[in-house]
Amino acid sequence: MASDFLQTYRNHVGERSVLGIPPLPLSAAQTADVIELLKNPPKGDEAILLELITHRGPAGVDNAAKVKASYLAAVAHGTEKCALISREHAAQLLGTMLGGYNISPMIALLDDLEPSVATQAAAGLKNTLLMFDQFHDVKEKADKGNSYAKSVMQSWANAEWFTSRPEVPESIMLTVFKVAGEINTDDLSPAPDAWSRPDIPLHALAMHKNPRPDQSVESLPEEEGKRGPIKFIDSLKAKGHLVAYVGDVVGTGSSRKSATNSVLWFTGQDIPFVPNKRFGGVCLGTKIAPIFYNTMEDSGALPISWT
């Protein structure tokens, strides 16, 4: 029941906060509950409902993303009314969903008679790369004279999705989390914890859960075999600089993506509008295993190997 959702969700938030991790992303059923509450928001809960639909619903082609995109599309087109989300705001939120179920609605909104709505749809498409065959739908509108579609095509041609991003700084001040010896992916993403890999924040708690030779006392696992040195890593982050993960040999083994997810959970930055996923971070090693290196790069990190 939608009426019971918020209390259940708050209980879930409390349970996860005890572990020091954020709540899970919304499921399709939870997203539907949020939407029902948005249609008639309980007094005092307006802010949390906006937070949930904006930041806690998955992007892409997740089932929950389909529910979210369908509702936002209806609001943006004006077939659904929402006191908390205007048509322009709905179009803007569609543009944060990266690709998947949001693409068709945004392309349709390029024809909207309200300029502010069409402008928001165009802005979202300019920063969306996962278009696949629907690129041709935008091109077709541009060829027929749609000015918003033309602006999207020109933006893609100019690679504004890339050039609009901050430049790589000349220098970066880092705090080092140094781990001696060879670090394999099982140190970062233990096989016995494979069941939790889809839940990145929870799985990351197992990183370095087993002690290593020559390990400093403060970097020992908080609970051997269960929980890694989370407080120690947090103390490094509290210094105010990016934390660089540093090792002698880093990333040997087979679980490259889940291992990367764990490292980036502690050293990276939140991906805007995408719950429980991070990008960025710095990884330094005398030697970084090639596939782990590539996976770090693909995840938006900066791996540097000096051999």
Predicted region positions:
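Fe-S-dependent hydro-lyases/dehydratases of central metabolism
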Residues: 95-96, 102, 109-110, 117-307
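Amphipathic alpha-helical scaffolding segments comprising HEAT/armadillo-like alpha-solenoid repeats
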Residues: 28-36, 59-78, 99-111, 130-142
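Short inter-helical turns and helix N-cap capping residues of alpha-solenoid HEAT/ARM repeat scaffolds
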Residues: 42, 82-83, 113-115, 146
